[in-house]
Amino acid sequence: MSTTTSSTKSIVTAGKSSRDIRRELKALEKSGRKVPSSPARRQRERREQVAGYGFLLPWLIGFLGLTLGPMLYSLYLAFTKYNLFKDPEWVGLDNFVRMFTEDPNYIQSVQITLVYVLVGTPIKLAAALGVAMLLNYRDKGSGFFRSSFYAPSLIGASVSVAIVWRAMFSTDGPVDSTLQVFGIDLGGWVGNVALVIPMMILLAVWQFGAPMVIFLAGLKQIPQELYEAAEVDGAGPFRKFKSVTIPMLSSVIFFNLLLETVHAFQVFASAYIISNGSGGPAGMTNFYTLYLYKRGFADLQMGYASAMAWVLVIAVAILAFILFKTSKGWVHYAGDNR
C-alpha cells in the first residue's frame, strides 16, 4: 500500500509546479481516488482552518456580546419588575397580563400601529410598483429619475426630514397655506387627530424609493416574449399586467411586502420628532416603538418595556410565518409548473 501511495505521489509531483500539483490533487479528489497526504499538507490545512476561525471570531464575539446576549437578558427582564435603580424582581407573567388588561395606552398604540402598517404598506408598494413600471418603459433620463425617486428612502428616516415634514404640515406651513387658497382650511395636520395618521402614512409612502428599485430590477427580468405572446392572444394593457407582470413579479412583491411590513412596525424617529416625544395629539402618534421607548426610558419601567419588545418580536415572527405560508398560493418562482 505504501509503495502505491509513494508511486502515486511521484507521478503527481514529478517535474511540475506547485500550482499544477494542487490542480491535479483536486482532480484526484473529485475522481474519488485516494489522494496522498503529507505532513506539510495537513499542516497547511490546519493553518487554513485556524485562519477561518480567526476571521469568524470578531463577528462571533460581536453577535454574542451585542445581539444574542442582550436579547436573552431582555427576555429575562420581561418577566421582572426592573427600573434601573433596583435589582430585577421576578414577577412572572404580570407584565404581559398588565399589558393587555390594565394599559389602555398600550392597546391604543397597537391599534394605531396596525392602521399605519395595514394602510401605509400597500399604498407604498403600489406607488413603488407604479413608478417602477413607468421607469421600465422609459430609457432616456431613467438614471436621473431613478436616483431622484430613490433619494427619499435614504434620508426619509432622518431627524432633519421629520422636522421639515412637521413644519410643512403645521398650521402656518406651506401645505395648509396652499389648501387655504382653494378654500380648504384644515387648521394644520400635526395637531389634528383625524389628519395626523394620514400625514404619517404620507411620509412613509414618500419613501417608496427602495422597493421601487427592487421592483424595477424584477421588471427587467421579465422576458418580452411573454408580452408579445399576450398581444397575439389579444390581451390589452390591463390583461398583460394581470396575467404576465403580476405572476412574474410575485416573488419580488412578496419580498418587498415582507420587508416593508417589518419596517413599518419599527416606525419611531418620525413619530418622536413630529409629536415632540409626546405621542400626541391624543396619543394618535403613539406608535408601538415610541410607546415602548417612553415606558422604558421615560418611565424607567425596563421590565415592562422588555415585555413589550418581546410581544412585538413574536407578533412580527407570526406575521412573517403567515406570509410565508400563504405565499405558496400566489408566489411563483422560475421553474414552477403551477
Task: Indicate where each model-derived feature is located.
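Transmembrane alpha-helical segments of polytopic membrane transport and secretion proteins
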Residues: 1-56, 140-142, 323-338
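A structural signal for multi-pass alpha-helical bundles of membrane permease subunits
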Residues: 48-338
